Design a protein with these regions (language model features):
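Catalytic-core regions of core metabolic enzymes
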Residues: 1-689, 697
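Short beta-strand element of the conserved SAM-dependent methyltransferase core
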Residues: 522, 573, 692, 783, ...
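Long, contiguous binding/interaction regions
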Residues: 697-886
């Protein structure tokens, strides 16, 4: 999250080119040429002993001779000199450096040198960066780019050059174009933090091959995506591609899960990437998912409809009033419907009349206009007419419009006109629909992430008991637990298993079966045979003692023949579950090398290919996230929506997934969990067979997770002055209803002091932003009083840290009728202790001069108070280091 040095990299005031040259095709020549041609406003300092001047600019023989320290240095010399030059730049006080090339063997030393001098590095093996708004072309690219609102971050120089060339042809602009190279120091997450606050950037596009820190990426991406759309293309989906790119192995569905969890949108290929660039550059914000299609032919409209149907898109329904107006305005032979086929002889006048009527209606959320080449109706003329209509119509600048002028040669001029007018334009109907559905999916993801989760009922968790059982098993040397051994651990988290007994031989199996009643199931116990099905190690519906004995002996015989060296630890005996009309599912937790623990859901079966057969989510899960996973599984046909007799209980399965998530989050000793099959029968879910792989764990249990979980350890019971006890705890997404009720019990005056304006009502989006926080970046403590199985919020204090984790802005609010009980002070003390322990240096806030109680409290807590009467505010600052010392 660190932003140290990024300002000097992305907004440099001066640049030194180390190894500048007058020899064409040398890196130092190309970099100087591009810097000067780009129109950079600050001094450019070529450093080379070989030339007195480079491209007309006075050169300096070495770094020590520079007249001042540059903000940014670019190493264009032989890689063997990198370390010495970087050390000299650091000693001279340079803040940032772009390293164009360096072998892997240098990486460790280069990073150590940069950290010693508190420098930031872009690269190595970076194409460089372009910032058109500053006239900055610090790259190898010979292609000039226009100013725009789209930022592009790439981990591939080849993809960067391709996008630059493509954008030049379409006269597409960028706010930043950054090629990361090997990301030795500066990485995607830091740039996302910077661009999220950049006023010139309205959308961000990422090309990724790997991640160095998944947790930082998810955190930064989630924060940035709340304000700006972010699209991602990720290569290396197959093992062969991963080997080619030399990237970390990992499940591709895990990337999907992380991208969706952060509120981003993934595009799958280069074709979609180009459509995405066009969309992000020009498309206006989407209000909904209803699409209206206008075309001058049925065939291209049908292609668009097919693509819309395949992506589960939604057509708009025209009102009777709109249909009547269209009938009156258009020729009688035109069928008024959606899509609206104006026929192949549609003139520009027909397009204009249609647009005027549709723009005045509220029947759609996005408008797609298709034009096929026609001798009777030239495309350029219709394009001019459409652009002028959009410009003059009062609602023109608010409509989400997509244009598709089909064909190549005859439509070039029309597409150029649309690009100049800032209207998104695409070559094919399918590409246009793909772009539209990208924005629909992005909007849907953002909306889902802000939905208030339901509070699940009867959630059980006995973390201490589960830990004790796991530690005991590890101390005994166990590395894997089967269904019988794992039962008490699952029961500690409310997960139901079928009662299981262990039999050493066939006679004991018969004895157990007689005790529990028939029919029964027998299952092999062997740590050396990963899949019981390999030796037919599961026998079901055994109804007599003779059947049990024969089945047990048969299992033992098959193991001796197929796996003679395998250890046999007996048999598991279970009452036969009622499978009639039930559905068999599978829930697996595995550790991904990039994103840590993953929760996977699929159908039961012998073969298990999670990339194809399961949907994947990152823990921790709440009820909303678990429900999305189940619904995603149904939509992608990874699980069935119903069995032969019963519909799948989505709420019940969601609650089970939350319980599994809690178990995994709380117990880092768990390496892998496989519940297979999980029998779903109406509202009952029973784990019939479970395998749990375990190992000792030493360290921060949260560090293995890509998303920081709810910090239970920060909960604290506090007694107020009136003797009432309340719970201080971090805020939860489920707190939104209680927070709304709390705000309703705060006076307008107190709300004015807190928000510096009159607040009539908070929207759901406002409250979601307050409750659905990233605990890595923000903390909010609520004081909660429990009454009759309900909770009410009495007060809230909050701190939002900057990306460097140096400063945090704080606020505190207490229910107006509870002042004087010491609640505000206790909440502030809790927040101060947390921010200090979290490594922050300063806590800052503002209030109004007439908020005397807050000013007095701040003074008591050691804040510096700066009364600014002209501004009408009081600045409050607490030095946390001094606070710690005192």
């Amino acid at each position: 999250m660190s932003q140290q040095g990024l300002e000097a990299l992305l907004r440099p005031k001066s640049i030194a080119v180390i190894g500048a040259s007058m020899k064409p095709h040398r890196a130092g020549y190309l970099m100087m040429r591009n810097l000067l041609a780009g129109g950079f406003n600050g001094p450019v300092l070529p450093v080379t002993p070989a030339w007195k001047a480079v491209l007309g600019v006075m050169a300096w023989p070495d770094i020590a001779s520079l007249p001042f320290t540059p903000d940014l240095a670019i190493l264009c010399t032989n890689a063997s000199r990198n370390l010495a030059l970087l050390d000299a730049l650091g000693a001279n006080g340079c803040k940032t450096c772009i390293i164009l090339s360096a072998p892997t063997s240098q990486h460790e030393e280069l990073l150590a040198c940069a950290r010693r001098h508190k420098m930031r590095l872009l690269g190595p093996n970076s194409l460089g960066l372009l910032a058109p708004w500053q006239g900055l072309n610090a790259s190898f690219s010979p292609v000039p780019i226009k100013q725009g609102k789209l930022a592009f971050i790439s981990q591939s120089a080849a993809v960067s050059n391709t996008i630059l060339d493509w954008a030049q042809q379409r006269e597409m602009g960028f706010s930043y174009f950054i090629a990361l190279g090997d990301s030795l120091d500066i990485d995607v997450d830091e740039l996302l933090d910077y661009l999220a606050r950049d006023s010139k950037t309205s959308a961000i596009l990422l090309y990724l091959e790997q991640l160095s820190d998944a947790r930082r990426f998810v955190s930064a991406a989630r924060s940035a995506s709340r304000n700006k759309p972010i699209l991602v293309i990720k290569s290396g989906r197959s093992p062969a591609a991963q080997r080619l790119l030399n990237t970390s192995a990992g499940m591709d569905p895990a990337w999907d899960a992380a991208i969706q969890r952060a509120g981003l949108l993934r595009v799958q290929d280069t074709h979609e990437l180009f459509s995405a660039v066009e969309t992000l550059s020009h498309m206006r914000p989407l209000r909904g998912d209803r699409l209206m299609i206008i075309s001058n032919g049925a065939a291209p409209a049908a292609l668009a409809l097919d693509e819309l149907w395949s992506r589960n898109g939604k057509l708009a329904t025209l009102s009777e009033e709109t249909c009547l107006q269209l009938r009156q305005a258009l020729p009688a032979h035109i069928d008024i419907a959606n899509p609206l086929d104006l026929c192949d002889d549609a003139s520009s006048e027909h397009y204009v009349k249609t647009l005027d009527i549709l723009l005045a209606s509220q029947d759609f959320d996005a408008l797609m206009v298709i034009h096929s080449p026609s001798a009777a109706a030239p495309g350029t003329e219709s394009a001019h007419a459409l652009i002028e209509t959009i410009k003059r119509h009062p609602r023109g600048r608010f409509v989400t419009l997509l244009t598709n002028w089909c064909g190549e040669f005859s439509s070039q001029e029309a597409r150029r006109l649309f690009s100049e007018a800032g209207l998104p334009t695409y070559r094919t109907p399918e590409g246009t629909i793909t772009a539209f559905m990208h924005m629909v999916e992005y909007r849907r993801n953002q909306k889902q992430l802000r939905e208030t989760p339901a509070l699940p009922s009867n959630l059980t968790s006995n973390t201490a008991e589960a830990h004790n059982l796991l530690q005991q098993a590890i101390a005994e040397g166990a590395t894997s637990l089967d269904t019988h051994e794992v039962q008490p651990i699952l029961h500690a988290y409310g997960l139901h298993t079928l009662p299981t007994w262990i039999a050493g031989d066939s006679a004991e199996a018969v004895h157990i079966a007689e005790q529990i009643g028939y029919p029964v199931a027998l299952k092999l116990r062997s740590p050396d045979i990963p899949h019981k099905s390999d030796v037919q190690g599961v026998m079901l519906y055994l109804r007599t003692a003779n059947e049990v004995q024969q089945a047990a002996n048969a299992i033992f015989d098959r193991v001796k023949m197929a796996w003679p060296q395998a250890r046999i630890h007996g048999l598991l005996v279970q009452s036969m579950a009622n499978r009639a009309g039930a559905q068999e599912l599978r829930v697996v937790v595995e550790h991904d090398p990039v994103f840590g623990p993953l929760i996977m859901l699929g159908e039961g079966g012998v073969e298990w290919r999670p990339e194809e057969q399961a949907v994947v989510a990152l823990p921790p899960l709440n009820m909303n996230l678990a429900r999305y996973l189940v619904i995603q599984g149904i939509k992608q046909r990874k699980i069935r929506a119903r069995s032969a007799q019963h519909p799948l209980d989505i709420v019940g399965l969601s609650q089970l997934l939350v319980q599994v998530s809690n178990l995994i989050v709380d117990c880092p000793e768990i390496q892998r969990l496989d519940i297979h099959p999980l029998l779903a029968s109406a509202s009952e879910f029973t784990a019939l067979d479970v395998t749990l792989d375990i190992a000792p764990f030493d360290g921060d249990s949260e560090s293995r997770l890509a998303v920081r979980p709810y910090p239970h350890q920060l909960e604290e019971w506090v007694e107020m002055k009136n003797g009432d006890r309340c719970l201080f705890r971090p805020i939860l997404p489920e707190d939104e209803p209680q927070l709304r009720q709390f705000i309703a019990q705060v006076t307008k005056e107190d709300l004015y002091y807190r928000y510096f304006s009159e607040i009539n009502e908070f929207t759901h989006e406002d409250l979601a932003n307050m409750t659905q926080i990233d605990y890595d970046r923000e903390m909010a403590f609520v004081a909660v009083r429990r009454l009759d199985n309900t909770e009410e919020i009495l007060g809230v204090t909050r701190a939002i840290s900057d990306p460097d984790n140096i400063d945090a802005e704080f606020a505190v609010l207490v229910r107006s009728d509870l002042k004087g009980l010491g609640l505000g002070r206790r909440l502030m003390e809790k927040l101060i202790a947390y921010t200090r322990d979290h490594g922050l240096r300063r806590l800052n806030g503002i209030t109004m001069p007439n908020n005397r109680s807050m000013v007095a409290l701040a003074r008591k807590l050691g804040f510096q108070v700066d009364i600014q009467l002209e501004e009408g505010i009081v600045g409050l600052t607490l030095n946390l280091a001094q606070c710690d010392e005192s």
